[in-house]
Amino acid sequence: MANQPSAEELKKKLSEMQFYVTQDRGTEPPFTGRLLHNKRDGVYHCLVCDTPLFHSHTKYDSGCGWPSFYQPVSEEAIRYIDDFSHGMQRVEIRCGNCDAHLGHVFPDGPQPTGERYCVNSASLAFSDEKNGDQLKG
């Protein structure tokens, strides 16, 4: 993993919610994320280290309250960890570069993968394909 900024540096760089989600494995409230309804073409990056994670063409409305994707940009982009917290068995997803918490992946997504990457907006930054504008979750 890449060198990650210290917790003190990240607290200065990130909002309270962004720090909670990416560093403390938190979850933003459903239907509140800034990137949930984003429909522009572009790439979703890790908010902490700017690693590309998902293309907009793999985003879909799952109705779960968080941005959902059916496939990451590459296998290396995401790190998978078994998560047995809160009395559930899930698979946590983290940035493959800096280890920031992103959300979870579930086996109930659309084809072609059948997977739903349920991602906190607060862990993402979006780069617009047409004009290069950046939007942070």
Swiss-Prot record:
The active site is at 118 (nucleophile). GO terms for cellular component: cytoplasm. It catalyses: L-methionyl-[protein] + [thioredoxin]-disulfide + H2O = L-methionyl-(R)-S-oxide-[protein] + [thioredoxin]-dithiol. Zn(2+) binds at residues 46, 49, 95, 98. Residues 7-129 form the MsrB domain. This is Peptide methionine sulfoxide reductase MsrB. GO terms for biological process: protein repair; response to oxidative stress. It comes from Salmonella typhimurium (strain LT2 / SGSC1412 / ATCC 700720). Binds 1 zinc ion per subunit. The zinc ion is important for the structural integrity of the protein. Pfam families: SelR.
